[in-house]
């Protein structure tokens, strides 16, 4: 990602994971179906991204954690209703539009209050537009995460269980 697309020196570039990148490009996330808004003030966006990544890895393993991971994702998905109550929608494009508007100080404060606790729940897809058409890169991303070089390659199953129990307890679905 680059802060200023006209500048091409290495300094303005930042590496971001696909989930974090989606939070920065909400308008594109909405168009590609890359996530929904949830109200989850108990945890931050980065923590949610880590939890969701663990959920997708566990679901891909097809072991005793698959059902637990599915329940954890279901619990997170129930928080869409809370986002809809607060904002009238769970579509990231709404949030992107509000953030790009020229708001008065009073309007910005009101928006900030409503948005406090709103998070982007990333889906199990990552669409890349190519000359040949749209391609879902998520299976390759998931394969890397599970590989020996990936972030979950060396993480024992016992740790995954702890992650899911902690996540479920935090959102009240223990």
Residue ranges and their predicted role:
Residues 1-14:
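Short linker/helix segments within small regulatory modules
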Residues 4, 62-70, 87-88, 106-111:
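Intrinsically disordered, low-complexity coil segments
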Residues 13-33:
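Short Cys/His-centered divalent metal-binding micro-motifs
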Residues 24-25, 60-62, 88-93:
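Repeat-unit-sized solenoid/scaffold elements
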Residues 28-81:
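Charged, amphipathic alpha-helical linkers/stalks
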Residues 78-174:
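C-terminal, charged low-complexity interaction regions
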